[in-house]
Amino acid sequence: MRKSKIAITLGLVVGIVLSAFAFLFGYTRYLLSLPTYDTEGTIPIETNLEQLPDVEPEMKEGMKIPVYNNPQIHNILLIGSDRRDDKSYGRSDSMILLSINEKTDKFHLTSFQRTIWVSIPKDTDPRYQRYWSPNNALNAAHTWGGPRLLLKTIQRNFRLDVQHYVKVDFKNFVKVIDRVGGVEIELTEAEASHLRGQGHQVTAGKQLLKGDACLAYSRIRRIDSDWKRMGRQRTVIEALIKKMRSMSPLSLPRVLEDIMRNLETNLTPGQLQSYIFNVLKYRKYEIDQMFVPIEQHKARTKTKSGHEVYKINWVKNIEAIRAFIEQ
């Protein structure tokens, strides 16, 4: 009789465990069905760059550096697009390289200033071929050829082998922030005043901002600079990560669904699944950040058309990025 009870108990435990695994497997498959997948394939390493025409001397020096790849560091370009219609790629207002360092248990966030003067491959969408020029601001690459051309441009100029991207439209990001109940942002008086002018009831200091207020906050530029705007966009991302870390694991599924539903990526479902399974581990990772170009190795200038751009010391910036993501 005793053996029979033990067998029944073990059977129940095994049944519960198997049911849990079946649920998790099914739920993960559901999550993986939500994003929009780009299946164009890998991006080859460019060669013979010394033969490129119209490359400025400072750029050529940077291009002599071999493309960097470290198997212990997973690089994913996070693209925040401010798309005004469904047919265009939109402007890549936010370009942040997420480097997951499995050796040091850290997330490194490298924000690229969108008006860095770069060399752009002639691999545009046919619709925008007439707008292409060999040198332009970094975010022009996304406008002319979407995420793939942006990845190629980053490889060529920053000497980084970044094969993967995750893209979200800022307007859709509002839903995710609302799902977590808003995020806490510390506002300056100037920022608060600007947001009040757009109808948001906020004051200076720490504020709990809902999605639409976060979107307005991340777009602020007129009160200071595009550089500060980059910082605000990253502040929102960090605040969201912090909020998700503090949430109960039982609350995360709905948030993950909203995030996945609003993603476009060239990661495969299998690769995404691997990152999802590591969510609990990643919650313990430290986060650090840097801006590119670095302050002492950039120069603000204007193009012939009057647009303000940054020309940079490529060798110094490339070295700084590598040192940062290896920490």
Where are these regions (language model features)?
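Non-catalytic, solvent-exposed segments at the cell envelope interface
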Residues: 2-327
